[in-house]
Amino acid sequence: MSQQSRRSIVKGAAWAAPAVLATATIPAYAASKPALDGWLLNILSRCSRDRRSGAWSTTYTINGQGNYPDRGLWVSNAPASATIGATKVTQYISDTVGQLTFQTGGTSNQWSPLAYDSTAPVRNGYIAYTTTFKGTWQYNATNKLWFPDSLPYFTTTVGRCITTLPVITARFVTVNGTVYSFERSGTLRPA
């Protein structure tokens, strides 16, 4: 009779454990909550210099336009019967660049201009800018997701060269009267 080493037994147990866990019953309260998901591409351009004036500048763009699942926004974990309400995105941008003015671009006509928001919760070292979606949401039965009828696109120019830009993006969506939020942060570097 051959004996197995302890190592091969432990190795086999490690592979078997996930299969056992995968079949465990998950209680109903553990189901995922609705969320405003998607990809907003934040782009910090390389510094450029105006040939006439010699002034340096950097362009910062927030681009949510594109096709699912690579770009855009969508509400997940909400049934076809859900009511999707107030939706907004607040972009906290490092105060080292001063207060910015954004231009709306692309087909973001259902989004309010991304503008300074004095009512947003204060984040030390950041200035808040908020846009609100004023369009309608359409349910896609194939993906079981809700999609807005337009996607955000904003751009601004900073009148100097920037090599890093700390940002925090906070997303908020109301589903059946409850507000759900999601936040992501990072430091942008020129593309």
Features from the language model and the residues they span:
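Short beta-strand elements
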Residues: 168, 175-191
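Low-complexity, intrinsically disordered segments enriched in Ser/Thr together with acidic residues
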Residues: 125-164
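N-terminal secretory signal peptides and thylakoid transit peptides that target proteins
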Residues: 1-17
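A short beta-turn/strand-edge loop motif at beta-sheet boundaries
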Residues: 79-86, 99-102, 162
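Short, solvent-exposed loop/turn segments enriched in Ser/Thr/Gly
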Residues: 53-72
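C-terminal segment of N-terminal export signals and the immediately downstream linker at the start
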Residues: 24-53
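A surface/secretory-pathway sequence property marking extracellular, secreted
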Residues: 87-133
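Buried hydrophobic-core signal for structured, non-transmembrane domains
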Residues: 71-76, 168-170
